[in-house]
Amino acid sequence: MKYLLILFVLLVSCSTHPRLFSNEGSLILKKKINRLIVSSELGATMGISIVSLKTGKPIYELNSEKLLMPASNNKLFTCAAALDFLGKDFFFFTNVLAQNENAILQGGGDPDLTVKDLDSLAYAVSKKVDSIDTLFLDDTFLDSVYFGNGWMWDEGPWWYAAPISALSVNDNCIDFYVQPGKEGQNAIINYFPNTKYISFQNQSLTVSRNTNLKKLKIDRDWSDKKNNFSVTGEIFYKEELDTLRRNIHDPTMFTGVLFKEMLEKHGLEINYVMKKKVSRNADTLATHKSLPLIKSASNLMNESDNLTAELFIKTIGRNNITQGNWKSGLDSVKSLLASSALIDTSQMRIADGSGVSRYNLTSAKQLTTFLGWVYESQYKNDFISTLPGGGKRNGTLERRLKTEGNYVKAKTGGLSGVSNLSGYVFSPRYGPVAFS
């Protein structure tokens, strides 16, 4: 019981109680959780569902059927669907093809393609051809809609709203490394990958005072769909090195320009770069094979990576319905929830795979029903292995539930005004428990 109570201190810290409520479950636990809810004196709406996975019966319920925004708890559905439709050993392929005097970089939706991976492809190509007239970019494995339904139009350059493409690299972001310069001079800012695809203007200032600082900002001209970055504001002269990530516009062209620069580094000259769907008579020059999907799934859940979630969804659509778009992928997810988890999907709304959209609506009971189904499924262990553990490094619960970490595996979720936690508690008293 101790572990469930500590868990619900977390839940009610971001929620409040109605003045009068009727709930169900274990009498002892109900009294203690209700007392925590009442004493919180906060003012938000909440839904709670705790279900014993031994008996299938509720241990505690409060507004459990109320539809609320799940935020990144949507990734629970996405992860399970990827394991079901694609499999833990699914691989993403990025190909370089040859056609006459041209080369084609063909994306396969790899969410974890790195700059190093791209450079290895460039090196392999440089050993097989002497020159390239045009580098064509083929991202047609998935559709060209960059942003999900209901994503806020003014998210701007933030990393969590990176555009989605079958040709993605470095999370479709630039990493800026910021540290103070000499007093009165600009901050020292380096960025990776170092590419001519972006422009960069540094108007920051290093100062000796540590109060009333003008916040240092790195912005992109996102409203005009450009990759012109500017740095403004102040930095204290004793500040530590910091890393800031910002997304880029047109990830396909970003990946293509990077690849062109790498090919040139390895001795090739390329005259043009443009987008084009590959024809059938092209020969393969080089291929990058991703790590197994389970590795990307772990990254999805522990880092709450939105790009990975949406690439999973579109790839599910491509493999299951032959159309690599959000509708096909989400229809597949809803079908899985309805047919396998026996959830009435007409009573929920799934607008994307990551939970960024505020159009998503799910109840706590739907989430615990889903978690109960996964617990009995063939990929139970794989799914649970991807979930962050309390107090475990490199996960979204790294600073939470440190003492109880061995008993809790759960996914966080957060938007402005929204905070969620769903997963499993392995309780010495109640046995395995699903909660949301």
Where in the sequence are the language-model features?
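Short, well-ordered beta-strand elements
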Residues: 105-107, 231-233, 244, 310-314, ...
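C-terminal soluble interaction/assembly domains
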Residues: 332, 346-436
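Beta-lactamase-like hydrolase cores
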Residues: 17-66, 86, 124-128
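A small/polar active-site loop signature that marks catalytic segments
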Residues: 208-382
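Short, Gly/Ser/Thr-enriched beta-strand-loop segments that form substrate-interacting elements
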Residues: 201-223, 283-289, 399-429
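Active-site SXXK
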Residues: 56, 70-88, 167, 258-263, ...
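Mid-domain, small-residue-enriched loop/turn segments at the edges of structured enzyme/sensor domains
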Residues: 45, 99-173, 181, 317-366
